[in-house]
Swiss-Prot record:
It holds the Pfam family Pterin_4a. Keywords: Lyase. GO terms for biological process: tetrahydrobiopterin biosynthetic process. The keyword Lyase applies. The keyword Lyase applies. Its EC number is 4.2.1.96. One of its GO terms (molecular function) is 4-alpha-hydroxytetrahydrobiopterin dehydratase activity. Belongs to the pterin-4-alpha-carbinolamine dehydratase family. This is Putative pterin-4-alpha-carbinolamine dehydratase 2. It comes from the Bacteria.
């Protein structure tokens, strides 16, 4: 797997509102805020199950109702289609839990 070209990256990120580039790294990130800890944990569980199936795992940080996620493909040393695919799944999971 190879990192996305700058043109492909820009095109694909345009479909993922709120996802931003990570400074000094070929990765993207987004913060999700939920009504409470239970909703945040339910979201993380859904993402974890999908990540395990895809054998592609996010970097994340959780405090109470907030989940910060960073995506990058370590084997490719950069952002790949796998990250974009996981970001789309994450968006659907967040929407199903009515993220704030």
């Amino acid at each position: 797997m190879t990192p996305l070209s700058p043109q492909a990256r820009a095109t694909l990120l345009a479909e993922l509102p709120g996802w931003t580039d990570v400074d000094n790294r070929d990765a993207i990130q987004k913060r999700f805020t939920f009504p409470d800890f239970n909703a945040a944990f339910a979201f993380m569980t859904r993402v974890a199950i999908q990540a395990e199936k895809a054998d592609h795992h996010p970097e994340w940080f959780n405090v109470y109702n907030r989940v910060d996620i960073t995506l990058s493909t370590h084997d490719a040393n950069g952002l790949t289609q796998r990250d974009i695919d996981l970001a789309h799944f994450i968006e659907r999971a967040a929407a199903s839990l009515r993220v704030e």
